[in-house]
Curated annotation (Swiss-Prot):
L-isoleucyl-5'-AMP binds at E564. It is found in: Cytoplasm. GO terms for cellular component: cytosol. Its EC number is 6.1.1.5. InterPro entries: aa-tRNA-synth_I_CS (IPR001412), aa-tRNA-synth_Ia (IPR002300), Anticodon_Ile_BEm (IPR033708), Ile-tRNA-ligase (IPR002301), Ile-tRNA-ligase_type1 (IPR023585), Ile-tRNA_ligase (IPR050081), M/V/L/I-tRNA-synth_anticd-bd (IPR013155), Rossmann-like_a/b/a_fold (IPR014729). It comes from the Bacteria. Binds 1 zinc ion per subunit. The keyword Nucleotide-binding applies. It is an enzyme of class 6 (ligase). SUPFAM superfamilies: Anticodon-binding domain of a subclass of class I aminoacyl-tRNA synthetases (SSF47323), Nucleotidylyl transferase (SSF52374), ValRS/IleRS/LeuRS editing domain (SSF50677). This is Isoleucine--tRNA ligase. ATP binds at K608. Its cofactor is Zn(2+).
Length: 940
């Protein structure tokens, strides 16, 4: 054989079998950065049609987690695929930099503002901390192979962005959407200040649990709802609460509209009365109340009770029944005492019904001087007094002490309260914001489409948006309020622009340093500066204006796509929609895509305590970013995204299949010059024409899947092509022709031309997903080309190929099926040691007339398709009794070991081996390929 080895066209490539991605990728990143790849891409798409994906900013605190990776990789795949489609798709990454988590981190280091450090110094420390966090996260995102303008990201703490956030608020105000109101917040009476969620800890606490009766104002109206006409005894609706001190602020009774409520008669201590209770809780309630006897009088849906009125148990006013989604039957009575000034759920439902937000409690936890009966008492100490008064009024049905989980201040470890405080709101209804936002939702494409109904329900039900916070590190609400009337300064909008100009130069500290007289002159004494800061959701929600509208890369274009996790319907998608609609009367986006959360192999959330966290840094350091990227692309993001070491291992296996396909392609176009060696499609061998046609059809499917953001379909179709059409069929068949044909023959160049065309197309197909691997392949492809695949567009060399009428797509599909059946028979023969390899086999195909006609089309070249040394097509009717059945009714098979000599060069067993005296170990085909014109192939 050694004599003939040099006559073979053996595959050769510098593209290694092993990706070694973890080591090789950082080198590529360095090269991309040094060569300004992102700017090269921008330059290549200058003046092209824009596609704007606006980056929802992650919070600048802590390391990135797997969810961050999913998000950034999905965005990157879209940006790259849109770029390949010819769009100018800049990507400006952003970070959310203000807010409580950063304050808490800085507090741990330097203490609270106003103690060891001034508020100004504290803000500077927050700015420095956020900048450091951004640097760490940026490095991790870059490592994922995400292309972006990493040197010029947007930060919500950039001076110009802070200024633009203020300008955005001025437009919202100018449009008439701002109003001042009150809202309950966590309040520590020891701190004398509001607490954020992160500052609240839950500890066990003993509290009084009481059942309280509210008597009916209009008995006949209530009875009518239950289908009754008269009843001689008192009727009450009963609430259960563990915070008796909030009863002075009661303004309603909440029931669940969809629950059944029962009017139950109870006799206790000789007294008869009827009570309204949730049907499911009647038995537990009457037992708790110590009833001697009870009977059900009637039932009705909670929704029927809406707006009936009941008397407050100790004040001289009555309150309505309202419907609340927060009402459950887990405990209590199924009726919830509602004090909008002392609870978030109460406040939200109270907003819907326009209830007064009563706040009888001062900063120090003591009832204010105008609080009837309880003025001057501390709320927790007043519990006993409230209970005693209820008993005196005959309204107390039960009283016990319970131990339950209760919010405490994380600093003082003392119980806290919910307390209404003055806040700034964007109104949902005073200028029609809710109606307009719902209209805009309909005009937006939501992917998946259930996102539309989800955000619609949220907008329909959401209360006014409280945009103010009492924090130090945040964009200030730059308003001047009249000291007596609490009215905004009449020139607020123009004053805000002047403040914004200062912030643009000096950052948000400019507001706190500002002397009101500098802007207001003599009016300064009549006005006070607002010291509240904006909710950080306002910061990020206004970036369509504060960032997109001001960055030159976006050139004034509107945003095409927002893409975030499914929690952002309530978060960034919502805040952006509200602000944009309030400012401009329209949504800030045309499409909104959401992806699910990452969960482990058992469907559990990632949690350090469970120990199931998969850090993206660990994956890139061990397997490489391309493996992580392939997992993201291959996973259907519309639901939960499952990830585990086992799943990533499967991604690595899939990656190897793609890599091995690419390696085969590169190895077999080694030495091929597309300028001089390309065979025109019409002159190609039929099988080569077919595979180019399949690649062209696949490209259409892939481009459609990319365009519709169906990346899991991209990977599925690509894997199918690599594994089935190429791996199991085409590449297997062409090895003989590729290796043994005369090196410059049409038979071989036809094959190489097809491989080259597929390579040019495939490197582009995979570039948005397997970016590192695509770059590696690109550099090894023959022919003149640009430096990077990422500046290219989809390959246009896969022109439509017309197949011979006899050799249609259906013909080749049929051949694939026949070959699969033949392979089963050959594999079985190998297992039973009947033959060594497929080339030792001679195959008889007993086929019906239609199949026989099709197979005979290929003549002697059928053996190359079936990878056997000899094939005979025989009529099905002549099949012997021992012929092997197949899955096809039209085909039976026979196999025997060839008795012919084996050709030393091509390994086929042929009768003509040794017919040429000078080459006694070769078949005549190999002799022709070595010394003659070279064999002619027409079909395969």
């Amino acid at each position: 054989m050694s004599d003939y080895k040099s006559t073979l066209n053996l595959p050769e490539t510098e593209f290694p079998m092993r990706g070694n991605l973890a080591n090789r990728e950082p080198e590529m990143l360095k090269s991309w950065n040094e060569k300004g790849l992102y700017q090269q891409i921008r330059e290549s798409r200058k003046d092209s049609k824009p596609f704007i994906l606006h980056d929802g900013p992650p919070y600048a605190n802590g390391d990135i987690h797997i969810g961050h990776s999913v998000n950034k990789i999905l965005k990157d795949i879209i940006i790259k695929s849109k770029t390949m489609s010819g769009f100018d798709a800049p990507y400006i990454p952003g970070w959310d930099c203000h807010g409580l988590p950063i304050e808490l981190k800085v507090e741990q280091k330097v203490g609270k503002p106003g103690h060891k450090v001034t508020a100004s110094e504290f803000r500077q420390k927050c700015r420095e901390y956020a900048a450091k966090q951004v640097d760490g996260q940026r490095d991790d995102f870059i490592r994922l192979g995400v292309f972006a303008d990493w040197q010029n990201p947007y930060l919500t703490m950039d001076y110009n962005t802070e200024a633009n956030i203020v300008r955005s608020l001025s437009k919202v105000i100018d449009s008439g959407h701002l109003h001042k109101g009150v809202k309950p917040v966590h309040w520590c009476t020891d701190c004398g200040s509001a607490l954020a969620e992160a500052e609240v800890e839950y500890e066990d606490k003993m509290s009084p649990a009481i059942d309280v009766a509210f008597t009916a104002v209009d008995k006949p109206a209530l009875l009518a709802k239950f289908g009754l006409t008269e009843y001689a005894h008192p009727i009450s609706m009963v609430i259960w609460t563990t915070t008796p001190w909030t009863l002075p602020a009661n303004r309603a009774l909440s029931v669940a509209g969809q629950l059944e409520y029962t009017l139950v008669e109870m006799v206790k201590d000789g007294q008869t009365q009827a009570l309204v209770l949730a049907q499911e809780l009647v038995e537990s309630c009457v037992e708790r109340f110590g009833a001697e006897t009870h009977k059900v009088l009637a039932n009705v849906l909670g929704s029927e009770l809406e707006l009936l009125r009941f008397n407050h148990p100790f004040y001289d006013f009555d309150v309505p029944v309202i419907l609340g989604e927060h009402v459950t039957v887990e405990s209590g009575t199924g009726v919830v005492h509602t004090a909008p000034g002392h609870g978030q759920d109460d406040f939200v439902v109270g907003q819907k019904y326009g209830l007064e937000v009563a706040n009888p409690v001062g900063d120090n936890g003591v009832y204010k001087a105008d609080t009837e009966i309880f003025a001057g008492q501390h709320v927790f100490k007043a519990n006993k007094a409230v209970v005693a008064l209820l008993e005196e009024k005959g309204a107390l049905l039960n009283h016990v002490a319970i131990n339950h989980s209760y919010p405490h201040c994380w600093r003082h470890k003392t119980p806290i309260i919910f307390r209404a405080t003055p806040q700034w709101f964007i109104s949902m209804d005073q200028k029609g914001l809710r109606t307009q936002a719902l209209s805009e939702i309909e005009k937006t494409q939501w992917i998946p489409d259930w996102g539309q109904s989800r955000i619609e329900k949220m907008v329909e039900n959401r209360p006014d948006w409280c945009i103010s916070r009492q924090r130090t590190w945040g964009v200030p609400i730059t308003l001047f309020v009249h000291r007596e009337t609490e009215e905004l300064h009449p020139d607020s909008v123009s004053l805000m622009e002047r403040v914004a100009n200062r912030i643009e130069q000096e950052g948000i500290q400019a507001w706190w340093d500002l002397d009101a007289a500098e802007l207001l002159g003599d009016e300064a004494e009549q006005y006070r500066k607002v010291t509240d800061t904006l909710d950080v959701w306002y910061d990020s929600g206004s970036t369509f204006s504060s960032v997109v509208a001001s960055r030159p890369e976006f050139n004034g274009h509107e945003v095409d796509l927002y893409l975030e996790g499914s929690d952002q319907h309530r978060g960034w998608f919502m805040s952006s929609l509200m602000i944009s609609t309030a400012m401009n009367g329209k949504a800030p986006y045309k499409q909104v895509l959401t992806h699910g959360f990452t969960v482990d192999g058992k469907g559990r959330k990632m949690s350090k305590s469970v120990g199931n966290v998969i850090a993206p840094q660990h994956v890139t350091n061990k397997l490489g970013a391309d493996i992580l990227r392939l997992w993201v692309a291959a996973t259907d993001y519309s639901g939960e995204m499952t990830v585990s070491d086992e799943i990533l291992k499967r991604s690595a296996d899939a990656y190897r299949r793609i890599r091995n396909t690419a390696r085969f392609l590169l190895a077999n176009i080694n030495g091929f010059n597309p300028e001089t060696d390309m065979v025109a499609v019409e002159d190609m061998v039929a099988l080569d024409r077919w595979v180019v046609r399949r690649a062209a059809a696949l490209q259409q499917e892939l481009l459609e899947a990319y365009d519709q953001y169906n990346f899991h379909l991209v990977t599925q179709k690509l894997m199918q092509f690599c594994s089935v059409e190429l791996g199991s069929f085409y590449l297997d068949i062409i090895k003989d022709r590729q290796y043994t044909a005369k090196d410059d023959s049409n038979a071989r160049r036809s094959c190489q031309s097809a491989l080259y065309l597929i390579s040019e197309a495939m490197v582009r197909w995979i570039a948005p997903v397997l970016s590192f691997t695509a770059d590696e392949i690109w550099k090894l492809l023959p022919g003149e080309r640009g430096e990077f695949v990422f500046t290219e567009t989809w390959y246009e060399g896969l022109q439509s190929v017309t197949l011979d009428s006899d050799l249609s797509d259906e013909f080749w599909e049929q051949l694939l099926t026949v070959r699969a059946e033949v392979n089963k028979v050959i594999e079985n023969a190998r297992r039973e040691k009947q033959i060594g390899g497929s080339l030792e086999a001679e195959i008889m195909l007993f086929a019906d007339e239609a199949l026989s006609t099709a197979l005979s089309t290929l003549g002697d070249e059928l053996r190359f398709v079936l990878l056997t040394s000899k094939t005979d097509v025989v009529a099905l009717s002549e099949a012997p009794a021992d012929a092997i059945e197949t899955e096809l009714a039209s085909l039976k098979l026979g196999l025997k070991k060839s008795e012919a000599e084996k050709c030393e060069r091509c390994w086929h067993h042929r009768e003509e081996v040794g017919q040429v005296a000078e080459h006694p170990t070769l078949c005549t085909r190999c002799v022709t390929n070595i010394e003659g014109e070279g064999e002619t192939r027409q079909f395969a």
